[in-house]
Amino acid sequence: MNLNRFERYPLTFGPSPITPLKRLSQHLGGKVELYAKREDCNSGLAFGGNKTRKLEYLIPEAIEQGCDTLVSIGGIQSNQTRQVAAVAAHLGMKCVLVQENWVNYSDAVYDRVGNIEMSRIMGADVRLDAAGFDIGIRPSWEKAMSDVVEQGGKPFPIPAGCSEHPYGGLGFVGFAKKLRQQEKELGFKFNYIVVCSVTGSTQAGMVVGFAADGRSKNVIGVDASAKPEQTKAQILRIARHTAELVELGREITEEDVVLDTRFAYPEYGLPNEGTLEAIRLCGSLEGVLTDPVYEGKSMHGMIEMVRRGEFPEGSKVLYAHLGGAPALNAYSFLFRDG
């Protein structure tokens, strides 16, 4: 596998820390050891997150092409767009963000706090759009790029989740490579890695990265899109492309992609009671914050897998915390009583 042939622009602190979730493990019976990989604090740029790690492999192309404006898209409380805004500010570039109405949630402050507030503070041109949630290339995003060109700028397109970019999976191939180094220091290997999946490139990169040591099927994606067929197809397509890029040496198959579809509902961006319980439980036992859109759902999934005995006794399970806590303010009504 050859990741080193791709240029990387450093935006993170390096390998994110691994912390044991001792109290949560004990609360769930103590038969499975839970750990967290803290991608939620991987950078000093506006709280970081998994997209910041992905952007390390996209930004060299933007610089090489002489682009002056990063153009991205997400929902109103998109973590992606906040991280793109932070990187643009860091590099001295302009930033245009299309924020679509992906979530059927009507909190009075939803479009004024959290991620979107931070993007505005960092100087991004934030454009609200009424379009609902879907996966793939969006007309509103293409129009935003055309607008930049018409105004004499040179846009660099960053699709939702970085996932439609050819290099969108590389950051989490690197994640797997760095984790192997950390495992050597810890003196053990993780039996399973749990990760949230929506647009697909985070899990796709992990699948490729861990295929190098035979653990691709040990990456358990937890769907948060409520469109699991689309998400799984995305993961597989991106993983196959990424495997070719890094010269993995074998084909990625459908069997390599494990996606648990039980925890995404009622729909994208809206938590169920199990997700809210998981957010409160992890927060109160570990001081680790997760959000109702992504990480709360993958945390819910991991907790339920432990409760149901789906991990063999003695397993060491790594929860990939991808970020997302800045969105909590937008859901303040749900937590008005804690």
Swiss-Prot record:
Named cofactor requirement(s): pyridoxal 5'-phosphate
Gene3D superfamilies hit by this protein: 3.40.50.1100
N6-(pyridoxal phosphate)lysine PTM sites in chain numbering: K51
GO molecular function: 1-aminocyclopropane-1-carboxylate deaminase activity; D-cysteine desulfhydrase activity; pyridoxal phosphate binding
Signal peptide region: none
Swiss-Prot/TrEMBL catalytic activity: 1-aminocyclopropane-1-carboxylate + H2O = 2-oxobutanoate + NH4(+)
Any GO BP: 1-aminocyclopropane-1-carboxylate metabolic process
Cited InterPro entries: ACCD_DCysDesulf (IPR027278), ACP_carboxylate_deaminase (IPR005965), ACP_carboxylate_deaminase_bac (IPR020601), TrpB-like_PALP (IPR001926), TrpB-like_PALP_sf (IPR036052)
Entry annotation: catalytic residues: S78 (nucleophile)
UniProt KW keywords: Hydrolase, Pyridoxal phosphate
EC id: 3.5.99.7
Family from the record: Belongs to the ACC deaminase/D-cysteine desulfhydrase family.
Name of the protein: 1-aminocyclopropane-1-carboxylate deaminase
Organism: Enterobacter cloacae
Gene: acdS
